[in-house]
Design a protein with these regions (language model features):
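Surface-exposed amphipathic alpha-helices with a cationic face
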Residues: 1, 19, 40-47, 97-107
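Glycine-rich beta-to-alpha transition loops that act as phosphate-gripper elements at the mouths
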Residues: 7-12, 32-33, 54-62
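Active-site beta->alpha loop and helix N-cap motifs at the rims of alpha/beta catalytic domains
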Residues: 1-9, 17-30, 36
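Glycine-rich phosphate-binding active-site loops on the catalytic face of alpha/beta enzymes
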Residues: 27-36, 72-92
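Hydrophobic faces of well-ordered beta-strands that scaffold small-molecule active sites
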Residues: 5-8, 26-28, 51-56, 76-78
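C-terminal helical cap(s) of enzyme catalytic domains, especially alpha/beta-barrels
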Residues: 69, 85-107
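A contiguous pocket-lining binding segment that forms or flanks enzyme active sites
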Residues: 24-27, 39, 46-51
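Catalytic cores of alpha/beta
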Residues: 13-21, 58-76
């Protein structure tokens, strides 16, 4: 059984190390502190092969996710904008489910 490893990287050195050990997808974290979309665009210049997954502070909004994909991100992670809610409320879980479905459909 194989395990797929997606490392979290914040520097070019870390990205190159991940690539050297065979990682195809690389999580860029924390993207909100590294410069956001501009950082990904800058990385793609010297690293056109980079299959980046930005993570950290990305809003659960279809247009924002689409923007990330349009600049070359292979996927995005969405956490805090979904999980800062009250999970004791069943409606909250349904709301999260609807948000995720919406994000996937508008890709």
């Amino acid at each position: 059984k194989k395990t797929y490893y997606i490392p979290g990287c914040a520097t070019v050195s870390e990205i190159l190390k991940a690539r050297s050990i065979g990682c195809e997808l690389i999580k860029i974290f924390p993207i909100n502190l590294l410069g956001g979309k501009k950082f990904i665009k800058t990385l793609k210049g010297p690293l056109p092969w980079l299959k980046a997954i930005p993570a950290g502070g990305i809003e659960a909004n279809p247009e924002i996710v689409k923007d990330w994909l349009n600049i070359g991100a292979k996927a995005v992670t969405i956490g805090s904008s979904l999980y800062n809610k009250d999970f004791s409320n069943k409606n909250t879980l349904l709301e999260i489910e609807k948000t995720l479905i919406s994000l996937m459909q508008k890709r």
